[in-house]
């Protein structure tokens, strides 16, 4: 049973995020994983790592995830009853078990650690990989840096298709950092940053000593505010880390012309309540 809406909203407004919220049943999770596996076979992992953008308009099963009642229960507790789905994307960090771009093609559900020397060797490899500048990671950033919006907050969901742990690059957040407003973002000096604009918040502005890891079991979700400072490390495990990222806004939000944040919104969907404002074109329902 979910906490009362008032409790959800209070924690979210104070901390800027919620984590470990159970959404999918065992069967729903298996169905979603099977459907995603079909896309991997069709398009290949290089494509499915980051290029499945706004496919909620193409695949019914993806739209069902974005409109899942338990998910929307949390979203509406934070944003109110009138909510738009703004944008969606699958993001996958595939396992990299050697330096370079080679990927493990084995069973993605298998935990590679074993007792004895196997565990020690794997952890040594993990240490080396975290210092490899080429491995995919997500730098410290705020989502709102890339969204030309005003009139309401952006809420981001990570719905986990795989377990998300420290060793495969789980989300890290700075609690309460959403209260500091927009921070400067500069071009990243490190290679491997998955952010398409390759920016990051300068390290001296990030209170990394306050960072909190947000591990998830497959079928759970985390949600965070568009101004929350967050990041994720490379996947140094032998397991995939895949999730469905969904952005929601209250219907009162509206796009703005900002040359630093150019953005179009061609895939908006009314997922709860009614839209009294009609700020976005081509809204689906």
Model regions: which residues?
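Residues that flank catalytic or metal-binding motifs in active/ligand-binding sites
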Residues: 58, 86, 153, 167-169, ...
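Active-site region of the double-stranded beta-helix
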Residues: 81, 133, 144, 149, ...
